[in-house]
């Protein structure tokens, strides 16, 4: 049986560059990842494929999954639910494939309560001035909204202590490389690999124990 895959939970403040860094990570073929497919109750749009773009479900089906604890994390936005189905993630991990989940901080904390052995990586800006410059550079938000995002970022950065690793996004390629090294290292943690040797070793007594 192959080693179970890792659940990599990747999050950070709005504007920190999560999507850009994730795309850089996925652009190289040196590691196989599965990007987690989200579930939603919003209507399926032309060209979208169930199980590829989203898992499309009715509101009743989604709420039943919430009730029975089958959602890793979820939120309601503009009248529709969005979230990460637990079954899909577990089935993929059981195949030995790493699952990469890019979500907001509150969602990441929901996931940690259900999958504590996941790898939780927090992407942080070099400083708040840099983060503000990036938000302004987007050209999509008013100054009021940007100020709100900065305040939210402060709150989220304070939650960094809940994560396993913090990666500074000072340069996209470097940040992506740091994340990949973290994942590679996690695959060699003793508690993750000892299971594969269970059939190879049978310890009946401690050879170093004094007689």
From Swiss-Prot:
GO molecular function, one term: guanylate kinase activity
Keyword Repeat in annotation: no
CDD domains assigned to the protein according to its UniProt record, in alphabetical order: GMPK (cd00071)
SMART domains recorded: GuKc (SM00072)
Binding sites annotated in the UniProt record for ATP: 12-19
Coiled-coil ranges per UniProt: none
InterPro entries xref list: GK/Ca_channel_bsu (IPR008145), Guanylate_kin-like_dom (IPR008144), Guanylate_kinase (IPR017665), Guanylate_kinase_CS (IPR020590), P-loop_NTPase (IPR027417)
Subcellular location(s) per record: Cytoplasm
Reaction(s) this enzyme catalyzes, per UniProt: GMP + ATP = GDP + ADP
Enzyme class: transferase
UniProt main location, coarse: cytoplasm
GO CC field: cytosol
Highest rank taxon of the organism: Bacteria
Residue ranges annotated for the Guanylate kinase-like domain, each copy included: 5-184
Keywords of the record: ATP-binding, Cytoplasm, Kinase, Nucleotide-binding, Transferase
Keyword Cytoplasm belongs to the record: yes
EC number, as in UniProt: 2.7.4.8
HAMAP family in alphabetical order: Guanylate_kinase
NCBIfam families, per database record: guanyl_kin (TIGR03263)
Function: Essential for recycling GMP and indirectly, cGMP.
Protein family: Belongs to the guanylate kinase family.
Protein name: Guanylate kinase
Species of provenance: Streptococcus pyogenes serotype M3 (strain ATCC BAA-595 / MGAS315)
């Amino acid at each position: 049986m192959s080693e179970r895959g890792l659940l990599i939970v990747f999050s950070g403040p709005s504007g920190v560059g999560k999507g850009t860094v994730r795309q850089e990570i996925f652009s190289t073929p040196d590691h196989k990842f599965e990007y987690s497919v989200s579930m939603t109750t919003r209507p399926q749009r032309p060209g979208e494929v169930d199980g590829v773009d989203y898992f499309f479900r009715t509101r009743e089906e989604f709420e039943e999954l919430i009730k029975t604890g089958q959602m890793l994390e979820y939120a309601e936005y503009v009248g529709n639910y969005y979230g990460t189905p637990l079954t899909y993630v577990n089935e993929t991990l059981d195949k030995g494939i790493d699952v990469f989940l890019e979500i907001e901080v509150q969602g990441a904390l929901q996931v940690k309560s259900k999958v504590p052995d996941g790898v939780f990586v927090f992407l942080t800006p070099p400083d708040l001035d840099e983060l503000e410059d990036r938000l302004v550079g987007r050209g999509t938000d008013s100054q009021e909204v940007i100020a709100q995002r900065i305040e939210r970022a402060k709150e989220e950065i304070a939650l960094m202590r809940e994560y396993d690793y913090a990666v500074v996004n000072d340069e996209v390629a470097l940040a992506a490389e740091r994340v990949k090294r973290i994942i590679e290292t996690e695959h060699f943690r003793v508690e993750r690999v000892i299971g594969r040797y269970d059939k190879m070793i049978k310890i009946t007594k401690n050879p170093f124990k004094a007689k």
